[in-house]
Amino acid sequence: VIQDVDRSAGKLVMATNAAFKPYEYYDGGSIIGLDVDMMHAICDKLGMSLEIEDIEFDAIINAVQSGKADVGVAGMTVTEDRLKSIDFTNSYTTSKQVIIVKDENASVQKMSFAEKLKENFITDNRWQYIAKGLLNTIIITVFAIIIGIVLGFLIAIIRTSHDKNGGFTILNFICRLYLTIVRGTPVMVQLLIIYFVIFASVDISKIVVAIIAFGLNSAAYVAEVVRSGIMAVDEGQFEAGRSLGLNYKQTMMSIILPQAVKNILPALCNEFISLLKETSISGYIGLMDLTKGGDIIRSVTYEAFMPLIA
């Protein structure tokens, strides 16, 4: 990288999958490689700064098509199907495919557990990938479950009110449509649509996108959990509240919901655990989560066991 180049022309966003040595890979916490060096040279020529987005290989073309990235560089093979969607530069390297087999006579130096631990986490401070991924995972899960609980309770109250007294007809229809769509589609599809379609032209933090996506997904499941908890409360509790002079809102807030919450707490805890595990797909939009951190370490050390245990 030439340090004294005027980079006032803006930035060039490069989408890649940094697990393909020697073209793009992690070293010392940074993404380097032949492709990266080439893109730095292009940016030096154009007077632009380079921003590298490490995302899943399958999402690179989507990132370019949606405008989230200006170029995709990841050792792609030119195919007829891909040419229908994107433009390729002239090929600047050729490679050949080989098949590898196990050599029974080869001598392999086995590493001790301590050596594997050092190689996977201590060398080049690779533990930081796990630490950063864990922090992002916790942040996404906590804020997403907050959105899920707040929106889920609101949807549950609207649907329950409609079932009991026929109110909120239009809102109930919207809520039912929302629940059908969200619960009937994979969360990965929802995440990709929100990032590459809805926020395609918006410069927004990936963590915020993940929080919104997982929060909206969680709300659909929380809503039905809360609704079942409300419906499980004996109808006599409603009648008792109304006989005491309380209106519907007061009865719901003071008598019904406290009992419903007590009944659904185990289910809400299960939803939190499920949401924590669902965040493992955040790497598809280039977000460093816990799973992505392990993938980066595994791509460098080729050790499958240790990163997964972490």
Positions of PLM-derived features:
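Short secondary-structure boundary/capping segments
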Residues: 3-5, 88-91, 200-201, 273
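Flexible loop residues that form catalytic
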Residues: 76-77, 193
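N-terminal, intrinsically disordered, polar/charged segments of Gram-positive cell-envelope systems
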Residues: 1-10, 106-114, 118-119
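A bilobed periplasmic-binding-protein/Venus flytrap-type ligand-binding module shared by bacterial periplasmic
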Residues: 97-107, 123
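Ligand-binding "clamshell"
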Residues: 80-95, 104
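Transmembrane alpha-helices and adjacent helix-loop boundaries
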Residues: 109-310
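Extracytoplasmic small-molecule ligand-binding "clamshell" domains
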Residues: 6-75
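Structural motif corresponding to alpha-helix initiation and N-cap regions
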Residues: 57-58, 82, 175
